[in-house]
């Protein structure tokens, strides 16, 4: 399959934007995580998520070209130079996590969802997307294993367990927004780009959350914003930080 329809393009941008911003959020914990091993782990996970985003942006910039020959500037334009209203990220990946318990809870909630999301495009008719999914599925599995390892240690401890569960409760309304139907998703499914809508995996993710934290997402009210077109208040400062180096010399070729 080559040549992207408008709906498939929107579908892929939402996917890429989530991976990009989650990678950036993880990267902001490098050097300030509670212990050195987590500096290194979050650095590695951030690189993976940013790599996933780059692969998805390249598919969009290259119009689905199986050769994957996308212009680097076109990829950078998608990643850094769109206006806020043109982004399709979920607010869940936009909000700041200034507390380690919050960051760890989001790490688990996100990767438990993304593992399911990437599986939906593993057999995509869009060849470069299927190839990207092969790597991403392996990496998301490792990400989830990392988060689970920490949670196995921290949840049984009263103080840390209480803080993590409180963070999960705080994040759940926004995390449900990851499953909101994306503009163009119906077209992507009809064209075989994805095997099913992402919200068909919500029940599986809900059961994972219930089993991991003893908290039922089905009892939580969703955030009032949906559709991935309304930016959170934390988005503007996050985007400014992401553009900081580009802003030093907009004409430079990196």
Predicted regions and their residues:
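Hydrophobic packing residues in well-ordered alpha-helices of helical domains and bundles
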Residues: 12, 42, 104, 133, ...
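Helix-loop segments that flank and shape redox-cofactor active sites
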Residues: 22-44, 114-129
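Amphipathic, well-ordered alpha-helical segments in soluble domains
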Residues: 18-26, 52, 56, 110-117, ...
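Acidic/His metal-coordination segments adjacent to aromatic residues that form catalytic metal sites
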Residues: 1-13, 80-107, 157-158, 171-191
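Extended, helix-rich structural scaffolds rather than catalytic motifs
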Residues: 162-254
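A contiguous pocket-lining binding segment that forms or flanks enzyme active sites
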Residues: 128-190
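Conserved alpha-helical segments that form or flank metal/cofactor-binding pockets of metalloenzymes
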Residues: 46-81, 147-155
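Internal, conserved structured core segments that host functional sites
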Residues: 91-146
